[in-house]
Amino acid sequence: MAEEKSYKYVIIGGGVAGGYAAREFSNQGLKPGELAIISKEPVPPFERPELTKVYIDLEVNPTLANIYVCAGTGEAKQYPNWYKEKGIDLIVGTEIVKADLASKTLVSDDGKIYKYQTLLIATGSTNIRLSEIGVQEADVKNIFYLREIEDSDELALAMELYVQRGKAVIIGGGFLGLEISSALRANNHEVTMVFPEPWLVHRFFTAEIASFYESYYANKGIKIIKGTVATGFSTNSDGEVTEVKLEDGRTLEANIVVAGVGARPATSLFKGQLEEEKGGIKTDGFFKTSVPDVYALGDVATFPMKMYGGTRRVEHADNARKSAAQAVKAIKAGEEGKTIPDYDYLPYFYSRFFKLSWEFYGENVGESVLFGDNDPKSPKPKFGTYWVKDGKVVGVFLEGGTQEEHKAIAKVARAQPSVESLDVLSEEGLSFATKFYSTSL
């Protein structure tokens, strides 16, 4: 007979959302043996964004312990013994292969059965593979996708192997492409980025913002090829990649390829059991799903946007952390016959690479207004962009800002103050946000 365990709460997924949900349960009050985290990854929850940043910096040579949650918010790191001390069963290296939400039963890949009273789905996303978008010979050696800790470990080994002679091609011009390119270049690899869009981070950056980063990267020796895609690869006798074939007929030498062509939420386990929307699991403002006692967090959740109306699915660590806290607070409040406010999320994105660091709050819709020093040759560039819709500032981007300035732009994005004109806003620049922030304290 299969081994069976029962818990009051079960979290499926050991990523950012799972780790921060565990922290919130601990903060709210948790009895030993009430909570289990079941994760297919072999390690405790860690800050996944760091896989493309500090974790592959060979000069820093960090360990996994450096990036355990809750390092991303400056709180104490949750080492393996933290879960033991809190009475949380951390079950790693175990994948749930069957979920019957009607009977509140989960079955793992090793045949064990887990029963729960309340389930939190924090399964995150899976990378889209090159073969899924029609790229030929995409299963050769030294093509990397960064999602799990093993991915970054393997890339770091390849970076060490090819140090001083590395030729890396990054397929994709999004956030991951920017971060990985800088890490490889900082570790003395020749780097080429390839993507089909007309500029970097096309869905998010304006052409003016992208122009700065493209020039900055060019000054660092990174080559950028736009408007084409990879179609296949050449290999040596060991099956290792040697060339990337492009649609425009060019070939690029490469002994390392990193693909960042998108991701999809990992929801297949629950198909036909939960209501879905916009590619994710539909939830309310407390991250409750269409099935009682089942919650969805982070990347997999499509939730109501209180500020803007409608619903949205957000793939970002910030939302993973905050949605986890919201769900756990809602669960505990419900047990006590209390209520909490609906989730009121302000979209937030950030990135850092080389000596640059930017943050964005709000929405990138409407007319854009550039301000500040966006000279890529500047020793300390500092610039930003406001987005104005219907006479109100609805989004703000800032490169090179301070902590206080980031608070200011966040305040502006949430309050959405009116502006006299775009010209006046451009002239005021960052001072518009800092003045608004100081007067609202």
From Swiss-Prot:
Q: Which domain of life is it from?
A: Eukaryota
Entry binding sites for NAD(+): G173, G174, F175, L176, G177, L178, E179, E197, R203, G262, E315, H316, Y350
Coiled-coil intervals, chain numbering: none
Q: Which SUPFAM superfamilies match?
A: FAD/NAD(P)-binding domain (SSF51905), FAD/NAD-linked reductases, dimerisation (C-terminal) domain (SSF55424)
Extract the InterPro entries matched here: FAD-oxidoreductase/Apoptosis (IPR050446), FAD/NAD-bd_sf (IPR036188), FAD/NAD-binding_dom (IPR023753), FAD/NAD-linked_Rdtase_dimer_sf (IPR016156), MDHAR3-like_C (IPR048618)
Catalyses which reaction? 2 monodehydro-L-ascorbate radical + NADH + H(+) = 2 L-ascorbate + NAD(+)
Its name, as the record gives it, is Monodehydroascorbate reductase 3
Lineage from the top down? Eukaryota, Viridiplantae, Streptophyta, Embryophyta, Tracheophyta
